[in-house]
Amino acid sequence: MAKKKTARKARPTSVETSYKFDDEKYEGLRFSATYDYGELALSKAASYLGGQKARIASFVVSMACLALMIVVLLADSHNMAPAIVLLALSMGGTAVSTNWHNMQLNYARNSSLGFKGTSSRRHVVVTGDAVYVADESGAEERYDLSDLRSVSVDDDGLLAGFGGRRYAYVPSAAMSASRFRELSRELEAARS
């Protein structure tokens, strides 16, 4: 029996796109990072929004309402109205704490962290007075350092918040560890 030959498509030799980000156009360049921006990066960036304190607080409120409902029912089993209200509050708190990451992700999608088009690469430039975020399509956003309101940093990345759903995300893998620490210190100092 003769073997059937199948045609194979040639794989591209380089995953990199032909678009090159130009750092020359920025005056006072301090830091520059280019990275792939996909669902995983969006999920990591979203995890910085709101932190975990709100999730933990909603869980505590949920458990407190549940305990209070039990106390109310033990005190008077015919007093159903407060018990139902406490049960509803407990269920609401549980829903918030359970779906906290999905809520963060939806908020991130509707902010400047969301995808604009099909671009999968982002370029972040920090100068002496602003942070620029550009993508492969050439779209660029400028955030003044004077508007910097929050900086969330850990070993995985950094999220700078500028208010009005404007954020700049830099994963730590996009630059060397020493440059990343330097960037986080400089942004923390600019926020103060």
Regions found by a protein language model. Name each.
Residues 4, 156-192:
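A membrane-cytosol interface segment of integral membrane proteins
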Residues 53-66, 90-102, 119:
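N-terminal non-globular leader segments, chiefly Sec-dependent signal peptides
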Residues 2-68, 72-73:
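N-terminal membrane-targeting/pre-transmembrane regions
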Residues 131, 141-156:
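Phosphoinositide-dependent membrane-docking surfaces
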Residues 126-128, 153-155, 162:
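Generic beta-strand structural signal
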Residues 95-142:
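Conserved beta-hairpin
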Residues 31, 122, 141-143, 166-168:
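Short beta-strand segments
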Residues 57, 61, 70-91:
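Hydrophobic alpha-helical transmembrane segments
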